[in-house]
Amino acid sequence: MTATIAFAEEAPQNADSIVKTLLAATESGNFAEFQQQGDAAFQAGITKDMFSKVSQQLAPALKGGYDLSFLTSLTQQGYDVYLWKITPNTGKDQFVAKLVLKNGEASGFWIQ
């Protein structure tokens, strides 16, 4: 059995731009900006109330500033999946952001 050593990769510019916009919209509570990043299914699947609850929960950690570190990319069922580590400057919990793209638009976005 052989192993291949992989070196750090960078997120594609489009994915990087979308995740930063989604995080900024989450931080500021800007639902319209958040929705603009996604395809029709993404937009239909996230209500303003759902977004507001998540924004209220995460905004305090994001507003203090954070470091966004790209982790890796995957291909799953024809979708491009990208993962980042979010380290808030508050020194509290870290998060993982998962962005799923199809044809250059967000099809899914999760922060865990």
Segments (PLM) and residue ranges:
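Intrinsically disordered/low-complexity terminal segments and short unstructured peptides
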Residues: M1-A3, N89
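Short charge-dense sequence patches
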Residues: A3-E9, I46-D49, F95, A106-S107
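Short, low-complexity N-terminal intrinsically disordered segments enriched in polar/charged residues
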Residues: A3-S28
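Short C-terminal domain-edge/linker segments immediately following a structured domain
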Residues: F7, G65-D67, L99-N103
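Short solvent-exposed beta->alpha transition segments
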Residues: D16-S17, T21, E33-D80, D93
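Exposed beta-sheet edge and beta->alpha loop/turn motif
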Residues: T72-Q112
